[in-house]
Amino acid sequence: MSNASYPTGVENHGGSLRIWFHYNGKRVRENLGVPDTAKNRKIAGELRTSVCFAIRMGSFDYAAQFPNSPNLKHFGLGKREITVKALSEKWLDLKKIEICANALNRYQSVIKNMLPMLGEKKLVSSITKEDLLFVRRDLLTGYQKLSNGKTSSIKGRSVVTVNYYMTTIAGMFQFATDNGYTSGNPFNGLAPLKKSKVKPDPLTRDEFIRFIEACRHQQTKNLWILAVYTGIRHGELVSLAWEDIDLKARTITIRRNYTKLGEFTPPKTDAGTGRTIHLVQPAIDALKSQAEMTMLGKQHSVEVKQREYGRTAVHKCTFVFSPQVTKQQQLSGPHYKVDSIRESWTSILKRAGLRHRKSYQSRHTYACWSLAAGANPSFIASQMGHTNAQMVFNVYGAWMKDVSDSSEPY
């Protein structure tokens, strides 16, 4: 071995080959971890030549060429270690200026559930794809944890929820990758779980009649008639004001939404903001009935948080639907909350003896009835606040094929 010929910059170190070169004015050595053979000496010499050429050309990426080199830290190129918990705190803090409070709350909830599963004290760089596969399995099939740390009797989560959790955390790990905390995102190549396409479950005409008859107050009837005959989102429904309605023109302009966090915001999508809903006669009749109860009510100034960080607007609102109509005023606010709308829906279904559905089916009922009546999908999309008709086709395509020729006109 002592008589072996070595290319310039190639040397034997403990039976293995290493190369040396100058980088940033310093002589550095890199172990190649290959045995000292004639063939390997030739390859090592070629590698060293290419490294020196890249350095001269200013295109040498030390971390890419030698990702595990102990020399990286001497040049400030090493991985920046951070724990999963510290990463989540940093990521959320930076996300605050990008997303609305409602979205931030969802992210915080995801991280609260995921941190114990990932290991909050583990280094981000140590998380592997195998770790993530086990986390995903536990999310889907394991028992959920309560806020007090105890295990609940609720087992598993839906595929939709699991995919949302994983996608959210994947974004956090991409942030880590982009900023040098890990050499690669372990979520790369991890496909979402397959999910079945859930068909809409609208109320039939007969069910809707039974539903309305089971309402205990005229305001409740008016609210659900308007919801079903407009397809309005429930956050938009509870924040609807008489200032948004033109009964003569038979239109509603959607200007705001009300979130679970108790904030007024613009509607969910840009396409849904400021959209005009054209009212059919049942909706007009419901609003005329409701006008007798609330149109002359107190006008409130509400702060609406805009999409641009830190910006707000003030809207003057005489709310169309008010819990003060049916309850003692001192115990109620000027408008409903979204959760109370859902509770109302569930209670009415029970009283009417109808099969349980989620309250969002009021929106599906509008779309399905409209399609059954031959309405243009693009028109329906604009009424519901979708960007284009593709969403209508995606969600209601299968249902459209099942519509009977005997469907009643809308």
Language-model segments: which ranges?
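Basic, Lys/Arg- and aromatic-enriched nucleic-acid-binding interface segment
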Residues: 148, 153-159, 163-165, 178, ...
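Short, charged hinge/linker segments at domain and secondary-structure junctions
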Residues: 59-71, 126-130, 174-196, 409-410
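Short functional hotspots where side chains directly engage DNA or cofactors
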Residues: 123, 188-189, 249-254, 358, ...
